[in-house]
């Protein structure tokens, strides 16, 4: 099973230009709103037509601008789960699912329907209409309709965005179990790094219609190449840098100097530091003084906003600090007891390990 996508599409001022290949895997398209994720899926499904390029699925050409091939959606064998599930509102659950069964006698279709209702735990809901179902039930019906269609590729467009939080994680386990039994390619569009990390072996980072980075999902999270990839994988702290030495940089937006574990190359324009990787100073490398700012309490951690202070204790210190970019520090509640002493304006010393400083390209 394989999917090759090499397409361009101009829509107003937006230019989509993506090239990637999937080989029997679950592949994520991760990016901010408006970066071209859903547009890419619509081009593959035949809902939108690229201006140029090729789309090939398991050796079948779905689209080729030069050869003037553009198969209609019903001939592409693409299963597309829309954000709103796109169930037929005037059809019952069983009729929605039967729409996906392409061939077979009436008895064979009914047997397939019965098996599908059992597999997706929809027994007892056969005669209900979509409006009478919960969000999770609607999603299961939509997935059931896709699977009985036996598509060559399944595309999930923000599959959990319409669900309440308490249902989301439960349904993620159910969807993952369904996909384990599927032998084709799966494309998943999401802006949620948690969903991408849980579901997808490989990821493509999209930025303004372009591929910013692609590779193994875990590798991208551990070592993003550029600012876009780092931001989309959850990094909150960025600073422009000036190279001081092979393993030393000045963080221009913070007025701080850091030692790095990775050699600093000419292409590196920024550093990124994940918010949970700072620690209270303990007499090691890369320690600095900050001014305590706002604190946001979450159920299991604190978010602390800090401003770096250069030359702690010097006159004019406060004015210098106010000009610097803030640093986000995420603190587990298990560590928070020792931090209760701090109030807004207090000084605190933090550290960061050289190996936790990410050297990033621009873009």
Label each residue range with its predicted role:
Residues 27-28, 70-72, 76-86, 187:
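ABC nucleotide-binding domain signature
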Residues 38-41, 141:
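ABC ATPase nucleotide-binding domain helices that frame the ATP-binding cleft
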Residues 42-45, 80, 84-92, 98, ...:
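Short switch/coupling loops within ABC ATPase nucleotide-binding domains
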Residues 48-49, 56, 86, 102:
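A position-specific signal in ABC ATPase nucleotide-binding domains
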């Amino acid at each position: 099973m394989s999917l090759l996508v090499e397409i361009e599409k101009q829509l107003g001022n937006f230019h989509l230009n993506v090239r990637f290949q999937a080989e029997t895997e679950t592949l994520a398209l991760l990016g901010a709103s408006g970066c071209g994720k859903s547009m890419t899926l619509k081009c593959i499904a035949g809902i939108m037509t690229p201006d140029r390029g090729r789309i090939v699925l398991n050796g079948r050409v779905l689209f080729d601008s030069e050869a003037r091939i553009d198969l209609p959606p019903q001939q592409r064998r693409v299963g597309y789960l829309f954000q709103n599930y796109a169930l037929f509102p005037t059809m019952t659950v069983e009729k929605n699912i039967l729409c996906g069964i392409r061939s077979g006698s009436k008895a064979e279709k009914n047997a397939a329907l019965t098996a599908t209702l059992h597999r997706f735990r929809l027994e007892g809901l056969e005669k209900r209409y979509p409006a009478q179902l919960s969000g999770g039930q609607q999603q299961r019906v939509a997935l059931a309709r896709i699977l009985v269609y036996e598509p060559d590729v399944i595309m999930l467009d923000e599959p959990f965005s319409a669900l309440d939080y308490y249902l989301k994680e439960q349904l993620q386990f159910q969807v993952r179990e369904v996909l384990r039994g599927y032998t084709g390619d799966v494309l998943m569009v999401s802006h949620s790094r948690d969903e991408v990390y849980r579901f997808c072996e490989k990821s493509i980072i999209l930025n303004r219609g372009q591929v910013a980075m692609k590779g193994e999902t875990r590798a991208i999270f551990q070592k993003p190449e550029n600012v876009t990839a780092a931001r989309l994988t959850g990094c909150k702290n960025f600073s422009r840098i000036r190279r001081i030495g092979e393993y030393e940089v000045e963080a221009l937006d913070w007025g701080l100097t850091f030692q790095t574990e990775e050699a600093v190359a000419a292409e590196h324009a920024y550093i990124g530091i994940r918010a949970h990787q700072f620690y209270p100073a303990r007499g090691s490398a890369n320690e600095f003084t900050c001014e305590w700012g706002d604190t946001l309490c979450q159920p299991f951690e604190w978010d602390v906003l800090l401003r770096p202070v250069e030359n702690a204790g010097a006159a004019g210190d406060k004015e210098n600090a106010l000009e610097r970019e803030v640093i986000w520090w995420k603190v587990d509640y298990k560590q928070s007891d020792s931090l209760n002493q701090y109030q807004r304006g207090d000084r605190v010393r933090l550290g960061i390990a050289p190996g936790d400083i990410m050297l990033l390209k621009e873009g």
